């Protein structure tokens, strides 16, 4: 079960990273058509600050919608009220960049619709990434709150000692057990990756054969769907849209528990560090 959870989070991260690279590609393409350095720096700053995947929680107190909307409105005003870029006769009608050198020239655009359409596509893609970011960070936070409430009820109903009376020896024992669980999980993942690499290497070496005792698949045949993990599904509901426009309650909760969740010795039900579960992307 832990392996499937890690595989699903890896798929979400890969998908989110692909969307991030697509946004940077659109920004670069816009700069090739309109070599304005200020617009380039503004778009890269917004994308890098709010949407690019990072190893820590990206939900801030400020909603993600307003920086993205401000970026789009500034670009729209520049397209509407300023002249289009022009290339001189010496450059044969091609733009080769401004302060940043472009070795491959772009044909001079004669219509503002192309620029506005490109800005609109970038804005919609960034909104989609923000919704995925909010929805993916909301599920682990809700699960952690449910787990904390259940543990609190068990501590009240049971005969456990108060937290003030826990000795240092018991804390050291719990930390040692958590380290052993984490080490066991890492060993299992390492063994699984080594086995997968060995199987891939064997298939690559015997790919030209029609079959082998260990691999009966033809070189271009896909494996069955049962051999893969269940595809991850992120649902975006009306609450996610509200969190996109208004202040997200999960941003405050993640900020308050950031120091606890970043600890590799924090306990959880899967044996994976809470920093991985709290920040899936």
Curated annotation (Swiss-Prot):
Any one GO cellular component localisation term in the record: Golgi membrane
Transmembrane segments: 22-42, 62-82, 84-104, 115-135
Cellular localization per UniProt: Endoplasmic reticulum membrane; Golgi apparatus membrane
Sorted UniProt keywords: Endoplasmic reticulum, Golgi apparatus, Membrane, Transmembrane, Transmembrane helix, Ubl conjugation pathway
Membrane topology, record value: Multi-pass membrane protein
Composition-biased stretches (Basic and acidic residues): 168-183
Sequence segments annotated as region (Disordered): 145-183, 256-281
Highest taxon, organism lineage: Eukaryota
Pathway assigned in UniProt: Protein modification; protein ubiquitination
Chief subcellular location: endoplasmic reticulum
Skewed-composition ranges (Acidic residues): 157-167
GO biological process, one term: SREBP signaling pathway
Compositionally biased residues, Polar residues: 145-154
The keyword Transmembrane helix is assigned to this record: yes
Keyword set includes Transmembrane helix: yes
Quaternary assembly: Component of the DSC E3 ubiquitin ligase complex composed of dsc1, dsc2, dsc3 and dsc4.
Role played: Component of the DSC E3 ubiquitin ligase complex which is required for the sre1 transcriptional activator proteolytic cleavage to release the soluble transcription factor from the membrane in low oxygen or sterol conditions. The complex also plays an important role in the multivesicular body (MVB) pathway and functions in a post-endoplasmic reticulum pathway for protein degradation.
Protein name: DSC E3 ubiquitin ligase complex subunit 4
């Amino acid at each position: 079960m832990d392996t499937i959870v890690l595989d699903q989070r890896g798929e979400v991260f890969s998908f989110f990273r692909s969307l991030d690279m697509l946004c940077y590609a659109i920004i670069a393409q816009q700069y090739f058509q309109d070599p304005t350095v200020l617009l380039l720096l503004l778009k890269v700053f917004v994308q890098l600050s709010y949407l690019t995947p990072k190893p820590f929680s990206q939900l801030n107190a400020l909603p993600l919608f307003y920086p993205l909307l401000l970026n789009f409105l500034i670009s729209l005003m520049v397209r509407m009220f300023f002249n289009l870029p022009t290339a001189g006769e010496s450059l044969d009608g091609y733009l080769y960049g401004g302060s940043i050198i472009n070795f491959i020239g772009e044909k001079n655009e004669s219509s503002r619709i192309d620029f506005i359409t490109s800005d609109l596509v970038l804005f919609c893609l960034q909104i989609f990434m923000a919704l995925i970011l909010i929805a993916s960070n909301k599920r682990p936070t809700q699960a952690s709150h449910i787990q904390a409430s259940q543990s609190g009820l068990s501590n009240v109903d049971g005969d456990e000692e108060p937290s003030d009376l826990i000795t240092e020896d018991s804390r050291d024992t719990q930390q040692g057990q958590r380290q052993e669980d984490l080490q066991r999980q890492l060993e299992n993942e390492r063994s699984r990756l080594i086995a997968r690499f060995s199987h891939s290497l064997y298939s690559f070496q015997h790919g030209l054969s029609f079959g082998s005792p260990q691999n009966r698949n033809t070189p271009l045949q896909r494996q069955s769907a049962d051999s893969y993990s269940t595809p991850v599904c992120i649902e975006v509901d009306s609450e996610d849209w509200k969190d996109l426009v208004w202040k997200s309650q999960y941003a405050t909760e993640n900020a308050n528990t950031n120091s606890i969740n970043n600890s590799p010795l924090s306990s959880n039900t899967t044996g994976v560090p809470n920093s991985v579960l709290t920040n899936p992307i």
